[in-house]
């Protein structure tokens, strides 16, 4: 690569390979490197090379060798785990600046680390898989046309969005209709693109016509081909003037909806009602609902009182067992005692399962060993400012550890996923009993276990429902977020994942959760809580002219500054405002629990994020460019591009 034929168009440091999930404490399992996009002659290459301790990147480029095959993450490298996602590590931001020398073709590897270096032509890429949004560093996995996977690239200092933006100059990246985190790679060639779409059967209509429309107006065509939308959303679907390359493209008639659309008329909401919260339920008031034999009476009224005012702190230890399904509302006091004895025996039988596993057995059980390691790391960082958990030898930490490992025995398919310790901590703090806390936690997980499933379908559905509610409540706010590439509401991901655990002070979390557990006034009050927070910050977001980076930063800075009573009051007011609308769309009624889902008349293509294109390229959820992940944040900030794009 000499002279003018070689040009680096993108370069990013802090891109690591995680070579062994099981040996995460070994520094050699994390290989720091630099990722580059390089133009050479008429081709474009993606290079990754490790950075040696001296600060110089290893000078080696991977050259595809048909006799050796593509680099793989399967049998050739049994300890490599492309899905390994480290937890919320706090690391130094002071790093030596590597010397970014030009890669030299054919250089010999200088160490074992240099053997991981690779180079691949962009034309050889088949797909790019992006990590799910969560509480860890983002990574990308690239798959070649030959079917092999390159080592996963973990961006410890952010940059996935910037890299994808650069790749979109040379490739068309379309989100798979089966998996929104998988980007299918197509060449910048209309005939090849048409062929690819035809074989994938992504469109009901003639693929050549769709590709023509896609190249002329990618923003609108993407939505019209992949999504069920409404004329309610049309303001958000119009491309920017500079985004369409053909000014003569005929507009779609308003009265002729395209196939696959669900047309719903825009509705006018009435005035938002005034709502006042009630005082908490006291122990004296609770006792008035206790009838003969210790059975609770008039349970719907009692639940409504809890929804309206919450519970006094001294009552939570007993009441939470009912709210979380550990104790039955209809059972007598004697039946409760028998139930607790039965559940206590069941708990300790499950606990004995992992307690009796020897160290040698655990070494041969990588799944259990992985769960234990992850739990130990998470427990050591959970609510350590709370006196119940502070200190290195605090018994509360041991209880957290034991309950979470026992839950792995109870629900082995799900096991342990980062974030679960955040859900258990307040429960254990309140009930202060190992067995009771376990079964209450199981009840909570029955409500939210879908949030932690690998497919992330539940989280994607909830974000879609949140977006629909927000469009009905505040279309201008949605238009503003769309204009700032924040319309996916990815900054709300952590809110929904762990039910606002990190957004409110600890006592407010207790109040919020007990209100949500009542199931009133409908099944998705937590979505209205998210709408309420956005509604409270509406003017700040819009009038300040925030861009996408500032929006993410502002949302992160709301942590511990919100008032739970104000948020709950506004969420209930939003619910009443929506339910008072006589023409509320049916899909919104479903979210609020006012209507049953309709049986689909014909299969519809799943909602999918729009493909990337050179003219207008909305990218996956924004992540940071230079900000190190912090323990209390799953969001990253991406600085503005130097070219102002």
From Swiss-Prot:
Keyword Protein transport: yes
Coiled coil: none
Annotated region (Required for interaction with OPTN), positions in chain: 217-309
Gene3D superfamilies: putative rabgap domain of human tbc1 domain family member 14 like domains, Ypt/Rab-GAP domain of gyp1p, domain 3
Site (Glutamine finger): 418
Primary localization: cytoplasm
SMART domains in the cross-refs: TBC
Record-annotated Rab-GAP TBC domain positions: 310-520
PTM sites of type Phosphoserine: 602, 604, 608
Protein keywords: Autophagy, Cytoplasm, Cytoplasmic vesicle, Endosome, GTPase activation, Phosphoprotein, Protein transport, Transport
Location within or outside the cell: Cytoplasmic vesicle, Autophagosome; Cytoplasm; Recycling endosome
Pfam families, per database record: PH_RBD, RabGAP-TBC
Record-level GO BP terms: autophagy; protein transport; retrograde transport, endosome to Golgi
Segments of skewed composition (Pro residues): 600-624
Arginine finger, annotated site positions: 377
Region (Disordered): 57-85, 596-645
Function: Probable GTPase-activating protein that inhibits RAB8A/B function. Reduces Rab8 recruitment to tubules emanating from the endocytic recycling compartment (ERC) and inhibits Rab8-mediated endocytic trafficking, such as that of transferrin receptor (TfR). Involved in regulation of autophagy.
Free-text note regarding domains: The arginine and glutamine fingers are critical for the GTPase-activating mechanism, they pull out Rab's 'switch 2' glutamine and insert in Rab's active site.
Name of the molecule in the record: TBC1 domain family member 17
């Amino acid at each position: 690569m000499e002279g003018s034929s070689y040009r680096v168009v993108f370069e990013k440091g802090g891109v690591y390979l995680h070579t062994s999930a099981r040996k995460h404490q070994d520094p050699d399992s994390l290989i720091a490197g630099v990722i580059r996009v390089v133009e050479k002659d008429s081709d474009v290459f993606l290079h990754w090379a490790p950075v040696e301790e001296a600060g110089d990147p290893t000078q080696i480029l991977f050259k595809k060798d048909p006799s050796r095959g593509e680099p793989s993450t399967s049998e050739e490298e049994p300890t490599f785990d492309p899905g390994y996602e480290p937890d919320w590590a706090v690391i130094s931001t002071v790093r030596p600046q590597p010397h970014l020398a030009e890669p030299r073709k054919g250089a010999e590897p200088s160490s074992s680390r240099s053997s991981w270096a690779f180079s691949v032509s962009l034309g050889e890429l088949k797909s790019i898989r992006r990590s799910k949004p969560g509480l860890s560093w983002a990574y990308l996995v690239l798959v070649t046309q030959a079917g092999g996977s390159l080592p996963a690239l973990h961006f410890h200092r952010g940059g996935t969005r910037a890299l994808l933006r650069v790749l979109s100059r040379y490739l068309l990246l379309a989100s798979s209709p089966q998996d929104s985190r998988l980007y299918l790679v197509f060449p910048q060639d209309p005939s090849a693109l048409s062929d690819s779409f035809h074989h994938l059967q992504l469109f009901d209509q003639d693929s050549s016509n769709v590709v023509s429309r896609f190249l002329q107006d990618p923003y609108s065509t993407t939505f019209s081909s992949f999504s069920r939308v409404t004329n309610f959303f049309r303001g958000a679907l119009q491309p920017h003037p500079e985004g369409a390359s053909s000014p003569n493209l005929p507009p779609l008639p308003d009265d002729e909806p395209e196939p696959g659309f669900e047309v719903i008329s825009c509705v006018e909401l009435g005035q938002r009602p005034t709502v006042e919260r009630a005082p908490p339920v006291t122990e004296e008031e609770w006792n008035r609902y206790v009838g003969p034999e210790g059975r609770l009476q008039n349970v719907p009224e009692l639940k409504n009182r809890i929804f309206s005012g919450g519970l006094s702190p001294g009552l939570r230890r007993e009441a939470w067992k009912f709210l979380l399904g550990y104790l039955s509302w209809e059972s007598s006091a004697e039946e409760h005692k028998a139930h607790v004895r039965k559940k206590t025996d069941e708990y300790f039988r499950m606990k004995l399962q992992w307690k009796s596993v020897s160290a040698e057995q655990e070494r041969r059980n990588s799944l259990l060993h992985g769960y234990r390691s992850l739990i130990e790391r998470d427990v050591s960082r959970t609510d350590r400012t709370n006196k119940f958990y502070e200190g290195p030898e605090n018994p509360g930490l041991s209880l957290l550890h034991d309950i979470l490992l026992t839950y792995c025995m109870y629900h082995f398919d799900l096991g342990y996923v980062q974030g679960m310790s955040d859900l258990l901590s307040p429960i254990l703090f309140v009930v202060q009993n190992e067995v009771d806390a376990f079964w209450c936690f199981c009840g909570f997980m029955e409500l939210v276990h879908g949030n932690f499933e690998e497919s992330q379908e539940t989280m994607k559905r909830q974000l879609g429902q949140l977006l629909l509610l927000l469009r009905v409540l505040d279309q201008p706010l949605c238009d503003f977020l769309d204009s700032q590439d924040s319309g996916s509401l990815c900054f709300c991901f952590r809110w929904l994942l762990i039910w606002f655990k990190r957004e409110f002070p600890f006592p407010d979390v207790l109040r919020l959760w007990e209100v949500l557990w009542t199931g009133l006034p409908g099944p998705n009050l937590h979505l209205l809580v998210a709408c309420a927070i956005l509604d409270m910050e509406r003017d700040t977001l819009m009038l300040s002219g925030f861009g996408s980076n500032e929006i993410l930063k502002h949302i992160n800075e709301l942590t511990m500054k919100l008032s739970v009573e104000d948020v709950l009051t506004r969420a209930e007011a939003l619910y009443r405002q929506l339910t008072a609308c006589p023409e509320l769309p049916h899909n919104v009624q479903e979210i609020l629990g006012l209507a049953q889902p309709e049986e689909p008349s014909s299969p519809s293509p799943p909602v999918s994020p729009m493909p990337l294109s050179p003219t207008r390229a909305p990218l996956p959820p924004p992540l940071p460019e230079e900000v190190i992940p912090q323990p209390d944040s799953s969001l990253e900030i991406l600085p503005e591009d130097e070219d102002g794009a």
